[in-house]
Amino acid sequence: MNFNPHDYQDYAIRYIKKHPVAAVLLDMGLGKTIISLTAVYDLLFDSFEVRRVLVVAPLRVARDTWPAEIQKWEHLRDLTYAVAVGTPKERKAALMQQADITIINRENIQWLIDESGFPFDFDMVIIDELSSFKNHKSKRFKSLMKIRPRIHRIIGLTGTPSSNGLMDLWAEFKVLDMGERLGRFITQYRTNYFMPDKRNGEIIYSYKPLPYAEDAIYRRISDITISMKSTDHLKMPELVSTEYEVQLSDTERSRYEDLKQELILQLPDGEVTAANAASLTGKLSQLANGAIYADTGEVIEFHDRKLDALEDIIEAANEKPLLVAYWFRHDLSRIKNRFNVREIKTNRDIADWNAGKIPVAVIHPASAGHGLNLQAGGSTLVWFGLTWSLELYQQTNARLWRQGQESGTVVIQHIITKGTIDERIVKALSKKEMTQTALIDAVKADLEVG
């Protein structure tokens, strides 16, 4: 197939070639893989600035998406590639090929650098999903930083540069510029841009940005960062986001509050800390959805309000396909017990959904990530159980709200239990979206000028 780049794609290709260090923030559906591969091809065979390229990506993307893109496009036919996933023996066989491009999953970057026995002779690295390196304490981050000075060109690709706020940006940009813009040390970054938020005496559990932090941080990174939002460059369907509120009965409300107090009383000193907040909110989310795991692992049913709401939504859809996102295993069990649904797990499931053969499909956000195209099968997504992760939330929504969606409108419905933690999750997602949008807008490329 011949590649005829859109103007924004041509701009991004030129940007990558011009900037040895770059953060390329491309929204889902904008073709970041073909953009990167085209730039790599030119750097390898036109300007001869690069000799070997390493691509680091999530497993499914490394195994399936990158090889498929290389094979798809006519202008890339001279590229050789090897996929270093699977067993150590299979990975070593891939490395021995000395291909132009070696593609490895992010879980194995530490193995490659510290354990494989192969010299690290890649002069260009592409990180597909820069947010994979947001944790500066992770083994993959530390391993990559060890050999970072040997890398002449590095590109970070992501559509979600600050899913959980500004703090994540330090590690992501340290990988790229070795601390030139946001500082060499996380303590320095915290001191410059943040102040303690939640604390217990001398123990600080979280930080909040100083009033000037966002603008200052965005200015610091703007010279190596470009961003192009999907809605600016593609004919995207209209996105309609709605909330379907359900109300607990007085008895259920009392039980919810009682269980909440029990959970709090079980905490050390009755205090919610950063260490136990995740566990607590997880249990409250279960209650909001209608069931909770007991300490024995048994599922205790609490209410059917969300199931009732889902029944109403299915009926109102009038056989129009629905994609339902769940979070807990008991969500899935209860949905399956009540409705005739099918999980999206295999290639056959994906094909049948896109062919319109599945009236109601269920999917977990963690399995709805990169490279999963479901837009041909429907245009309505129902969130039965919410997630705190903006990255998973947006990736799941983008399975339907993307280029190629034939419906003029995509509807995202959230089933919210009033007076529960659901309302806080929706608010948190909104706040994170604002932070991320501010980042993207602050460093957006001006295509007319560029």
How would you describe each model-predicted region?
Residues 52, 78, 97, 124, ...:
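Conserved P-loop NTPase motor "coupling/switch" region that bridges the ATPase
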Residues 1, 17-18, 31, 35-45, ...:
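Conserved Helicase C-terminal RecA-like lobe
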Residues 35, 50-72, 163-168, 328-329:
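Conserved Walker A/P-loop ATP-binding site and its immediately adjacent core
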Residues 1-25:
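Conserved pre-motif I regulatory segment
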Residues 88-122:
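Conserved helix/coil segment N-terminal to the catalytic DExD/H
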Residues 61-86, 176-179:
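Conserved helix-turn-beta segment of the N-terminal RecA-like "Helicase ATP-binding" lobe
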Residues 388-450:
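A conserved SF2-helicase RecA2
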Residues 109-115, 164-166, 326, 330-334, ...:
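SF2 helicase motor core recognition
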